[in-house]
């Protein structure tokens, strides 16, 4: 293994950096900027059973230290993802493990999509999105209720043929309760944090700046919240965490790993700089040299032993 390599259920990664779902499309959108094979993995855009048009515009607005978004899980649906999106990645980047993000209105939706999408040859794991704050039906209910999160996870684990990661919402009183419930239900790993629900108002119009009124807050402003929640979750569950939330630099990525994350998702940074992920990857080893970190697996071991 190289210094940057990390291993998680279903994922033997050359490095821990991956674009977070919803911030990188299905990969082809960024392939014109750099060779995607440099990435550890790609968490592709959420897939639902049927196509979704998403929320009305305006969907995105800048905020101090970040952005609000209310995309509404726009995607072409399972059939198109299986017939076009995943095969394109398999053809052009055959050695790149894909994490397929899955969303739905009902347990049956999640189960059906996971059953099918986990059969794609390049899908190494599925990430079930129980935490999106923008959809008026389904997701947020699963993500904020201990019993619902447990039962959904249990159903998906039984249906999927690859490891299952559960994406947790920060919009809860105690994220460790949801983490324990999904781990007890058989989740192979967790991803956190998703966006925090926020709102801004246009003073001249006296209306919210985005059409959905509320949206998910992301970007550098949420990094300290991500650090706190990753630290809390990794102290109460034994399954690995892919950390995300406000990562803009190599130092941010290492900070999440020092908080307990085993790998790192990069979201909003991809919008401000299409080359954000390779820049973060390239900056890791020099920073590790400065901090006397022999390898990321050594760092993971040290963090676990310090608990």
UniProtKB/Swiss-Prot annotation:
Coiled coil regions in record: none
Requisite cofactors: FMN
Keywords: Cytoplasm, Flavoprotein, FMN, NAD, Oxidoreductase, Pyrimidine biosynthesis
Location relative to the cell: Cytoplasm
Residues binding substrate, per UniProt: 45, 69-73, 129, 194-195
GO BP terms: 'de novo' pyrimidine nucleobase biosynthetic process; 'de novo' UMP biosynthetic process
Pathway field: Pyrimidine metabolism; UMP biosynthesis via de novo pathway; orotate from (S)-dihydroorotate (NAD(+) route): step 1/1
EC number: 1.3.1.14
Gene3D superfamilies in the cross-refs: Aldolase class I
Catalytic activity annotation: (S)-dihydroorotate + NAD(+) = orotate + NADH + H(+)
Annotated cofactor note: Binds 1 FMN per subunit.
Residues annotated to bind FMN: 21, 45-46, 101, 129, 167, 193, 219, 245-246, 267-268
GO MF term list: dihydroorotate dehydrogenase (NAD+) activity
One matching Pfam family: DHO_dh
Membership in a protein family: Belongs to the dihydroorotate dehydrogenase family. Type 1 subfamily.
Record text on subunit structure and interactions: Heterotetramer of 2 PyrK and 2 PyrD type B subunits.
Primary role: Catalyzes the conversion of dihydroorotate to orotate with NAD(+) as electron acceptor.
Name listed for the protein in its UniProt record: Dihydroorotate dehydrogenase B (NAD(+)), catalytic subunit
Taxonomic source organism: Cutibacterium acnes (strain DSM 16379 / KPA171202) (Propionibacterium acnes)
Gene (name only): pyrD
